[in-house]
Amino acid sequence: MPGPCASAAAFSCILVLLLLGCQRSNPLAAGATVSSMRRLTDTINIGFLAEYSQMRVTLGGLPLAIEDVNKNPNLLPGKKLAFKPVDIGHKMSAYRVKPLRAMTQMREAGVTAFIGPDESCTTEALLASAWNTPMLSFKCSDPIVSNKSTFHTFARTLAPASKVSKSVISLLNAFHWNKFSIVVSSKPIWGSDVARAIQELAEARNFTISHFKYISDYIPTTKTLSQIDKIIEETYATTRIYVFIGEHIAMVDFVRGLQNRRLLESGDYIVVSVDDEIYDSNRRVNIMERNYLDPYIRKEKSKSLDKISFRSVIKISMTYPQNPHIRVPIYGLHLYDSVMIYVRAITEVLRLGGDIYDGNLVMSHIFNRSYHSIQGFDVYIDSNGDAEGNYTVITLQNDVGSGASIGSLAKMSMQPVGFFAYDKNSVIPEFRYIKNDRPIQWLNGRPPLAEPLCGFHGELCPRKKLDWRYLVSGPLCALVVVVAIALLIKHYRYEQTLAGLLWKVDMKDVTVINLGEYNNPTNKNIFQICRQSILVVGEPNKRSFTNIALFRGNIVAMKKIHKKSVDITRSIRKELKLMREVRHENIINFIGASTDHGSVIIFTTYCARGSLEDVLANEDLHLDHMFISSLVSDILKGMIYLHDSEIISHGNLRSSNCLIDSRWVCQISDFGLHELKAGQEEPNKSELELKRALCMAPELLRDAYRPGRGSQKGDVYSFGILLYEMIGRKGPWGDTAYSKEEIIQFVKCPEMLQHGVFRPALTHTHLDIPDYIRKCLCQCWDEDPEVRPDIRLVRMHLKELQAGLKPNIFDNMLSIMEKYAYNLEGLVQERTNLLYEEKKKTDMLLYQMLPRPVAELLKRGDPVEAECFDCVTILFSDIVGFTELCTTSTPFEVVEMLNDWYTCCDSIISNYDVYKVETIGDAYMVVSGLPLQNGSRHAGEIASLALHLLETVGNLKIRHKPTETVQLRIGVHSGPCAAGVVGQKMPRYCLFGDTVNTASRMESTGDSMRIHISEATYQLLQVIGSYVCIERGLTSIKGKGDMRTYWLTKRQQPELTPDLISTVDTLDTYCSGPRESMEVSVHQYCSPASNNYRLGSCNCDTKCLYSRRSDDNVTNSHGTSEFPKVSEPAQVNCNQLCVCRLNSSQMFNNRGPRSAPSITFRL
């Protein structure tokens, strides 16, 4: 059964035949089209086929090449070059029809050649060959198109992967390495093609391939590393030259395997590495370091490669473009070259009088020729139309200008030493040194041999009976024994250090502290030390902080590892030893750990001000530029130290892991001890995982088996999130409508969003920051971890942020503490003002619920004793027909009606010296004469209030029954009673006594819209005067028998104008104005208590204002004057604006909290 490639080729041939058949079915049309194309002399059109979505940056090479062609008078003289682009879309299968249709349409439009397509090009190249139309590709790597018996009009500027085989054979031939082994990593798809090409050329030149080994699906795991070790074990005895084909990371592990077997120290072995990496001479990358190229697998420094091992590595890599003015993707340069070599070919054809539509003729001017590439070097196109490619030989060399001697490892890096020169008369190129005075620095001063002089097994040299080596074997063995003993002693001391348990903390020396137990004498001093952190981040129980304890006289922080059982293995001991050795001012100090009772508790130094997350969440704490700069500088210095130490990386950098000590120095915590923390069951683990994931790099989120220590590039990403949080102070992702789960999913899978990667908003509307910070954040958040800067480079980018910091750390600390003190003073003053305003509101609400004297007693905590009053007046009111009204109304309508009525009553009683006791349903109870006694005025106050209520209720409409009004029934009685506060929760000021019951009976036996008063109230009103009452007669009162009662009808006020009603209740009354214009009328009465009171009336032609002051002076527009007390009946006429005031030393102090102003004006 034919394979899929054969099926695809067959289908391509069918498509081409169908298209050709369609054109041949209409020869006249085809001939007309060709004729029209050949008549085009002014503009030469070429067709461009590419996938726009994947080649946006690369596509710029095409218009640039067209522009350069049209500007060059030596190219296409008298003509102009243009192009017709077509987006062929993504290659979903091998049977694309869209490119063929586009090619047909462009051919009919008169194009002379096709540039492209990228990726697969077999079908398109076959169709172009059938039309005899040139096609030049800049990215296609299909090997089948090199067959010129079928694809005779196709050429490409991108060298196939197999072309490197010629350079490999040339290098081997240059150093006479005719025996070698090939090791191929099957992960790169081009690896097998390169290996087969090397094998074919080696066999053609009689080279011997000792071994041919494959590394299947290379992934840097223990299983794959063991596979590499097995290959080395099987091959090292019969080979000296290895040709390694695969990715750089696989080659590093292969070299590590050779180093572990100590094969590279003598310089007898060499590794020729072949990969598709482009060498950049401007980038000094220490490529032998595994940790740089493998960010998701970190090795301890003790296991990293020595540079001496890489002196036995020769790397063959593609030559980096030499043109210093061009910095574009490599495929863009190939695209430019494709246009230029075609234009040069047709220029020669036109100069010789040929036909540019003859594809074979045009291609004859391209095959077997060299051209100067825009990359800065010459490229040769062979007879198959394939570019040979340029390759560079790279080895470990001394850096230029380093001053180090040759062979010194002080300053060495991988540098280019040679290249390959092509000759059309030779199958393979010639290896040449770039500089003759800069050869390869061999480890033992010469190139290694492909085979030892005596053969791999000594078969080429006859054995001698006596060998001098036997003579030195004894001393050499003794030396080995001595060295072994020394190593054992060193190892023993190291093991003793690990077993010494210097990190262990005995819980007997630890005193756990509970800040809530303030009365405990042991904790009082500690509470004073820790209270500063409470001032910063609020209450201790609201802080995301750990427990604290006292250890050897020092306050330490405790963190428990939530594991059921812990086995302190050797690797965990090494972790604990390493943590004790880490010391830096911006790194939290690890004190030790306790493993008593099967649990692990980690002890670190205590940071009094909590975490950076707590500080940022405290809106009362102002963080200015100096605060932010100082904290950022501390974090960067701490992370640089971590990255340079054996810890290597943090892995969980976020604001909650940056702690602030009492000196406002930021210290990084929660790093290292990954094996000890592995598998712990943390409380609220899901929520903690979400918080960690918000600051985690996308490549780590996608890794299901991500290491606990993360990666250095991942730390750079996390620092960017942390810097964003510090500047915005709105969380790691600022103001966003997405949930934590959605944010993590978008970061993990950017393909879910149309606009690509998902990062925190950096627009000016979301965050007002300088451009250099915005640029630094974008670099830290790059999707490709290799593009992100390292932490030292981030510090350089943010150097401008630290411009305001002083070089002396002590001066910075004093400045920060001074600003913090000023901020704290302002905060205390603001909180004091807010407390005062809240106290005023609370007092106002309390005075509305209880009488002021009673409220003051309750506020002071004094008991409120019941008090008896000799004579008070009580009023009861009731809505007539309320029960019937409730049956015809909804509950909400009843509540609405009562609220309207009670609101009206409350506004009325505020004008009288009365106290509202309570409301029960529709009943309204008011008293006058308590808790502050007012003599005999209580009857007059209640009577005036009752008349006022009747006058008002007549105009009060029922909202849900607009045609009806409220009908009121009022009862009043005067007599003795007792009053006091009942209950402790929701205290009530209640009245007790027969007077209360009698007043209630007065109301219940009264009539609608009438005021029913008792005889006692009537007598008091007669003493006061001006109240008109009508005797009702004897009325049967329940529980009292027959009582003589009266109807209160109105109040007479002779000599008062309707514009002003005034009641003066004090002995001292003044009115400003001319003395001669005043007439005062005062009626003197005597109360039962023999207290003198005066009632007067003020008749003003102008409006009067009322004010309470502590003085007796009256101020008017003419100045200040004093008037004597009014002692004679008189009528007061105020022709000017007057202000009437009360003497606070008189009866004002006896008023209740709801008493009316002593002078009331109706304006």
Swiss-Prot record:
Residue stretches making up the Protein kinase domain: 507-800
Cellular location(s): Membrane
Record keywords: cGMP biosynthesis, Disulfide bond, Glycoprotein, GTP-binding, Lyase, Membrane, Nucleotide-binding, Receptor, Signal, Transmembrane, Transmembrane helix
Topological domain ranges for the Extracellular compartment: 29-469
PROSITE patterns in the record: GUANYLATE_CYCLASE_1 (PS00452), GUANYLATE_CYCLASE_2 (PS50125), PROTEIN_KINASE_DOM (PS50011)
Glycosylation sites: N147, N206, N368, N390
Topology within the bilayer: Single-pass type I membrane protein
Segments forming domain Guanylate cyclase: 873-1003
Topological domains, Cytoplasmic: 491-1163
UniProt similarity note: Belongs to the adenylyl cyclase class-4/guanylyl cyclase family.
Protein name: Guanylate cyclase 32E
Native source species: Drosophila melanogaster
